[in-house]
Each structure stands twice: as structure tokens, then as C-alpha cells.
Amino acid sequence: FEHSDQIAHANLCGFGKSVIQAVLEGKVEQLVLVNCCDSMRRVYDIVESTGKCKFLYMLDLPHDDNECEKVKFAGTIRRLKKAYEAYSGKVFDKRAFIKSFITPEMNTEPYIGVLGVRVSGILEDMIRDNIQMDVENLTCTGGRKLSVVQDEMWNMEEEELFLSYADVLLGQMPCFRMNRSIRRNRLYLDPNLKGIIYHTIKFCDYYGFEYASIKRDIKVPLLKIETD
């Protein structure tokens, strides 16, 4: 992180530094960040100060999944849509949006679960190459399953469509940062889960607490790995 280390705090997480580094190297001109933690808010401030992103947007992520938060989140997503339409000159394609949903395959075979902080594609491939069993990415980058009914979405007006989208987004397996993350216990109780590789990242405390809880209660083999 040669460039990002010059303008970011030394204790900023590696993911945050990698985002800043990519912007400074000219690899990213359009960026949507989610204010899921203090690090991402600092990344937004730093990237904004550089002036190197043509489109920069901070998406406000709720920490609850009640009805009020769903309505609020739907409005937030619509504002992002409108902001990008104004920037790009393109119009939101409802057909492409609805067609992008696919029915996920249900895994009924024994597998090793990767939990914790998001894993990069390189790290995920390395884990798969070295484990002689199916590997399921259960972090926020791999466990994205939305329960949508496409036929119903075709007839929805924009406001209803985005409310439905916000509903299913917040109805997913919750991130550990959510105020009510108890549903994450389902991940550990799956009878097909035969082991856990738990990924943490330096200077990110959230998932250290969950790891301690899993280590105390889980009955399958558990391996903790930490990256920068």
C-alpha cells in the first residue's frame, strides 16, 4: 500500500487501504461505498479529498431489519439510482435488473464453510485448491441469496419494486454488524457443515468477537486465518 500509507492512518484495515490504493493508481473512477464501519467512512473521506473519482457515493446501510428500516433503505437505494442516472446519462433498466436474479442451488453435500470477514477471490481460490471437499463462501461476498419472486416484480411500480428489493436484501443472513445477528447461528448448525475456516482481518475487531463465540460453542473443526 505504498500510496495509501502516505495519506491513510496506519491502523486502517487492509481492505480500506486497497480501495484507496486502487483509486490513487487510477484503477477506479466510479465507486460506491457502504458505511458498514468506521473504516469505510474514513475511506470515503480520503477518496473524496483526492478528487480522483468521477462518481463517488456513500450508501447508508441500516443496522436493523424492521419495517421502518426497509422503507428507509429503499429510499436510499433509489437515491443512488437517481444519482448514477444523473452522472452517467443512462436510465435504470428494470428488465435487466429483474433478469439478474437466479435461483441458487441448494448444497446437500458435506462442505467446509468460510466465515468471517469478506474474502478476496484470490484467497477463496487458494482455499478451494487446498481443501479436498466442497468449500462454501459464507461471508458477505459469497452468501448472497435473495428470496425474490420475479413474476411479481414485473408488475411493480418503481417505489414498490425498490421496497421489495430492500426487503429481501435485509432479509438475508445478517452481517455480524447488524443489531440482531442471532440468525447467523443457522450457519453453524447446518448438519452438512464439516469444518470452518474463519477469516479475520488486521485492525477489524467486529469478527473477533464472533470467532470467540464460535470457538466456545462449535463442534466441528475450526481454523482461524488472518490477513492484512
State where each predicted segment sits.
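An N-terminal assembly and electron-transfer interface module characteristic of large anaerobic redox
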Residues: 1-228
